Amino acid sequence: MSSYAVLWSEPRQEVETGKLELEPAGLRFEGSRGRRPARVHRVPYGEIEHVRIGHRIQERLGGRPSVVLDLAAGGRLRIGLVDAPGVRSELADELTRLSAKTD
């Protein structure tokens, strides 16, 4: 299981910080926002319709391009990596591969 230090933003939500784990069935985000207690959010790979790198201003997190997931339920989930920029493309490629397996 791979793990990444990330920022993420769900549709109509504020940015959260924490970690992302690539589990066998989907993504597992664990983190917090401000003083709110930590929470876990899961996204099954089958819910991911498209993966891309978001370069536009409104797609960035922390001023950097993000990995953008177009979700079947509607909306986009943005993932910003705290690690080196090269990891962003690796994560996008891995998520594309994992989400394609569910088709």
Q: What kind of region is each of these model predictions?
A:
Residues 1-24, 41-42, 71-77, 87-93, ...:
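Anionic N-terminal interaction surfaces
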Residues 12-16, 23-64:
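Phosphoinositide-binding peripheral membrane targeting modules
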Residues 34-35, 82-85:
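Short, solvent-exposed aromatic-acidic interface loops
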Residues 54-82:
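Canonical pleckstrin homology
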